[in-house]
Amino acid sequence: MLPIRWFLALLAVFLAVAGLDLWFSQTGARPSSATGEERLDGAAFLAAANAGELREGHIVYRANSTGLADLHAQRKGAAGAGATHVRATARLTDAEVTALRTQHFAEDDPVSYAAARAVSARERTASIVHAIVHPLGLITLIVGILFVVQRYAGRFTAFSAQRLRPVTSGVSFSSVAGCDEAKDEVYEVVEFLRDPARFRQTGGRMPKGVLLVGPPGTGKTMLAKAVAGEARANFYSLSGSDFVELYVGVGASRVRSLFKKARETAPSIIFIDEIDAIGRQRSAAESGGAQQEHDQTLNALLVAMDGFDSDDAVVVFGATNRPDTMDRALLRPGRFDRQVSVGLPDLRGRLAILQVHAGSVKLDPSVDLQEIAKATPGFSGADLANLLNEGAIHAARHRRATILHSDLDEARDKINWGRETRRVMTVQDKAVIAYHEAGHALMQVLSGEDVVRVQKVTIIPRGRSLGSTHFTPERDLFNYSQPQLIAKLRCLMAGRVAEEIALGSITSGASGDIQEATKTARQMVLEWGMSPLGFMALSRPDGDEPLASPQTFHEAERHVRALLDENYAATTRALTTHRAALDAIADELIRCETILGNDVRRIAAQHPPSALAG
């Protein structure tokens, strides 16, 4: 590489010469093209002048010398590049002076002509400077470009030494919770890296790659770190986007350098997060530099995974939440042999994750993590960690030394529905929201479904929601029975029905309930066979064109409409019969703004149904 001091020296020379050139330009000098000079005797000069061969002539009389003068001119045929300056010294007669005047020779005294000759000398110097500056500037520019390219080329090709420095993972399987099945599947990799001879004895071959598939935040990165930590292997962690650059060939170069380094430091674990950034399916329809760079990077990855065997003690872990976009060549045996699903944790998994993260925060002894786990279905490991962190922040904001159950409830509501917003609402607005939420809560209690229970009802706005009813499943639900789906439909309809019964009008607040109820009813009829049409799939799960004929599909739509109408009528009858309980729950909400599920069940028990059951 070119030393930087050489580059700086050349740059200084360039700037100095450029400054000199600028000075000549500012003083008004113009480069002269005169490159030769011809010396004649007086007679020859006068003959050339009388013949009209000279131009721009000057007669410079010498001081204290009668008639003696220096004669200067240029030959007319030498204009432009290579012009010749003609000089002579002669003692002129009056007739000769008159003849030169006829040829437009100027008469100067020695002082004025000396100044003119100084300007001419400066012009010649400026010409020389220009002849030097231009090639020197070009050379300096080329050298500078080479210096920058040599110095920074590594940033656009292979990974830097810092990026390829392996780390020793301090994570163990005890730090990873909520994915026991996934841990069991990848534990074979740990055993192989610890004792590869045992597998070679049976002729077995360990997978070269393991693809971790699951939604974001489920612990895929932690699982890969745990494998490296348990196997005492070097850990290389990169993202798929780290291989993507503007210039074609950069990604492939980085893949090769990564695998070369991993082999040198084996046993090694290479973890590529969001691997779909470089592993997505190739397409012949797409073209251009970006597609060419992607294809070259993917090809380099395929070749690299083919280029090592089990003896290299290098295993590649990839993580993605879009396995359907992966190129099939990358998923074939011999590359990513195994796919491990890392899904959202179940109730037991959520409890285990909460117990792991609870060690880093100060929970009050009254906090029941089992209840928190029940109240957080659908939460990932990252969501649960964030829940405890938000609870700690909420407790600190209220100057408490420990985290209470109410802090975690507030944190969960904030994560699910947004921050609490205190809006100024009229009495009428509060009544509408209170009856709407009271209808949801009461209908869930009346359904008799004990798997999902009302946990809390509030009319305090959060995010876009003006109020909400929170439900807690007693256990994880993996499928739904038809009675459970009917109960869900009626609970969704109860908000609108309560408004209509109590206030005599309806509002736009039920738009989300209508969409969810319609979706559930359509799934019951079109996908799950819960209609008189029987055991028949009428639509695809992805929502594409229907599988049935237009006539059959039209009949199915009529069954969807009938299912909604029937349950809307049943919901109206139930809430009309329990109008007293509905009014009492709504009044309690208007007074307290938030009530617990136990309060809803208590009020419903205290207000038996009326005799108007018809």
Swiss-Prot record:
InterPro entries: AAA+_ATPase, AAA_lid_3, ATPase_AAA_core, ATPase_AAA_CS, FtsH, P-loop_NTPase, Peptidase_M41, Peptidase_M41-like. It is a multi-pass membrane protein. The keyword Transcription regulation does not apply. It is found in: Cell inner membrane. Its cofactor is Zn(2+). Residues 27-127 are periplasmic. In the central section; belongs to the AAA ATPase family. This is ATP-dependent zinc metalloprotease FtsH. It comes from Opitutus terrae (strain DSM 11246 / JCM 15787 / PB90-1).
